[in-house]
């Protein structure tokens, strides 16, 4: 259980950028910042291990790590270029898992796709926090 908590804590490090952690934990009290972040990670990892076991987590990690949309399709660019539907890309400016410098070129491989970048300090977790901005983009993308 402790190993799974440690693995999840390490994964969480990539979900928020430093600025997002500071923003989330700023307030007027004198609590030590590191204590707040540690408390946040302990809380999140304790929640996580209630729903996941180590084997399920390893399986999902293996699937994510081995995913290659271009495998057997002539590469990523060829595979993506075969998409014939309207696509809307929404990227978080501080996302380190799916950074803008990777997402914009990907969107350009699909004719007629739309790319939107939301300025946020919350990294990958921005998609959970910037819901109003996402809703506005999706509303404009829906017929």
Q: What are the roles of these predicted feature ranges?
A:
Residues 55-62, 136:
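Feature representing long, continuous alpha-helical segments
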Residues 13, 51, 109:
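Conserved catalytic core of Hanks-type protein kinase domains
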Residues 43-44, 59-79:
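Active-site nucleophile elbow and catalytic-triad environment of alpha/beta-hydrolase enzymes
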Residues 104-105, 112-143:
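Catalytic active-site module of serine/aspartate enzymes centered on a nucleophile-bearing elbow/loop
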Residues 1-47:
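Alpha/beta-hydrolase-fold enzymes
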Residues 66-68, 96-99, 123-126:
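Flexible loop/turn segments at secondary-structure boundaries
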Residues 83, 89-91:
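Short beta-strand/loop motif that positions the catalytic acidic residue
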Residues 72-76, 85, 96-108:
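Short alpha-helix in the alpha/beta-hydrolase fold that links the catalytic acid
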């Amino acid at each position: 259980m402790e190993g799974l908590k440690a693995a999840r804590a390490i994964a969480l490090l990539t979900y928020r950028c430093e600025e997002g952690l500071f923003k989330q934990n700023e307030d007027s009290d004198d609590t030590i910042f590191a204590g707040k972040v540690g408390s946040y990670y302990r809380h999140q990892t304790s929640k996580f291990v209630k729903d996941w076991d180590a084997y399920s987590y390893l399986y999902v990690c293996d699937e994510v790590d081995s995913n290659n949309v271009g495998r057997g399709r002539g590469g990523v660019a060829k595979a993506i270029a075969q998409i014939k539907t309207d696509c809307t890309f929404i990227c978080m400016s501080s996302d380190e898992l799916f950074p803008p410098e990777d997402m914009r070129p990907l969107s350009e491989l699909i004719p007629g796709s739309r790319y939107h970048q939301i300025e946020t300090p919350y990294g990958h977790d921005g998609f959970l926090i910037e819901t109003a901005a996402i809703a506005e983009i999706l509303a404009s993308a829906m017929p």
